[in-house]
């Protein structure tokens, strides 16, 4: 699996791995790259079956497989220890990495994540699946911003959204791969295993997230033994895109604090 690695800003700089959500594209993290690369070696990637890592995914594709293939790619790149920043599905992959490779994951940042899929989130995806079956990729892509962004943010950026739609259609991961990745997301359940995650965790959520209620992050915080929760009042599901200034400050402070906390505990 292809990874994109930034040059380390100094010798032995900590590594931060960015894992996007269901869309799978590493470019999702563009608003974070410049600030992160000043302090960390940053790893981005298109998830298997998407972008520049094309593949046909098995029907039983799982979050555990997503975690394993990423860890193997990191080891092949010479990376043994890394912090993880995961958004939604990416946060699930991050938790799986922390469970399966505890000696490798130094810190976990969960952005609008959850223990197991909430009934409201499941309802949103049911609607989106019906759109995919009835209207194809175009209907899926055109509806997607409604679940990602606040209404006023979208209204002020109509040309940008049209350009994003065209790009998303041109690089659509395919109906079968999308549904298999979505099914993996829906099957994931960390409610009985989260207390085994021992690395320090920062939980970031947006109170106006339409897709994933912020209560999901509260449940996550209660279940994780070494976690802290930060709430953004505005930004929607893709709060790192809509309000990068606020998000980046939380992310940078969280990474620095948790990495220091971990080193002090060793």
UniProtKB/Swiss-Prot annotation:
It is an enzyme of class 3 (hydrolase). GO terms for biological process: nitrogen utilization; uracil catabolic process. It comes from the Bacteria. It catalyses: carbamate + 2 H(+) = NH4(+) + CO2. Its EC number is 3.5.1.-. Residues 14-115 form the AB hydrolase-1 domain. One of its GO terms (molecular function) is hydrolase activity, acting on carbon-nitrogen (but not peptide) bonds, in linear amides. InterPro entries: AB_hydrolase_1, AB_hydrolase_fold, AB_hydrolase_sf, Pyrimidine_utilisation_RutD. Keywords: Hydrolase. Pfam families: Abhydrolase_1. SUPFAM superfamilies: alpha/beta-Hydrolases (SSF53474). Involved in pyrimidine catabolism. May facilitate the hydrolysis of carbamate, a reaction that can also occur spontaneously. Belongs to the AB hydrolase superfamily. Hydrolase RutD family. PANTHER family: MONOACYLGLYCEROL LIPASE. This is Putative carbamate hydrolase RutD. It comes from Escherichia coli (strain 55989 / EAEC).
């Amino acid at each position: 699996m292809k990874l994109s690695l930034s040059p380390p800003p100094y010798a032995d700089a900590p590594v931060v791995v960015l894992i996007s959500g269901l869309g799978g594209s590493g470019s999702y993290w563009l608003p974070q790259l410049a600030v992160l690369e000043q302090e960390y070696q940053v790893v981005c990637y298109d998830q298997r079956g998407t972008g520049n890592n094309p593949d046909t995914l098995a029907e039983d594709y799982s979050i555990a497989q997503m975690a394993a293939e990423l860890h193997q790619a990191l080891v092949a790149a010479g990376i043994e220890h890394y912090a993880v920043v995961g958004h939604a599905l990416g946060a699930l992959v991050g938790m799986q990495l922390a469970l399966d490779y505890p000696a490798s994951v130094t810190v976990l940042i969960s952005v609008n994540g959850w223990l197991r899929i909430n009934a409201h989130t499941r309802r949103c995806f049911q609607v989106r699946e019906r759109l995919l079956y009835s209207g194809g990729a175009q209907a899926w892509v055109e509806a997607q911003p409604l679940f990602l962004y606040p209404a006023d943010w979208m209204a002020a950026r109509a040309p940008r959204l049209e350009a994003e739609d065209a790009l998303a259609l041109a690089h659509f991961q395919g109906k079968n791969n999308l549904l298999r990745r979505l099914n993996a997301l829906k099957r994931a359940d960390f409610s009985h295993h989260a207390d085994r995650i021992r690395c320090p965790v920062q939980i970031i959520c947006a109170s106006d997230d339409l897709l994933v209620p912020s209560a999901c992050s509260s449940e996550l915080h209660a279940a994780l033994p070494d976690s802290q929760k930060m709430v953004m009042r505005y930004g929607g599901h893709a709060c790192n895109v809509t309000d990068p200034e606020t998000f980046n400050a939380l992310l940078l402070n969280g990474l620095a604090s948790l990495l220091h906390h971990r080193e002090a505990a060793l």
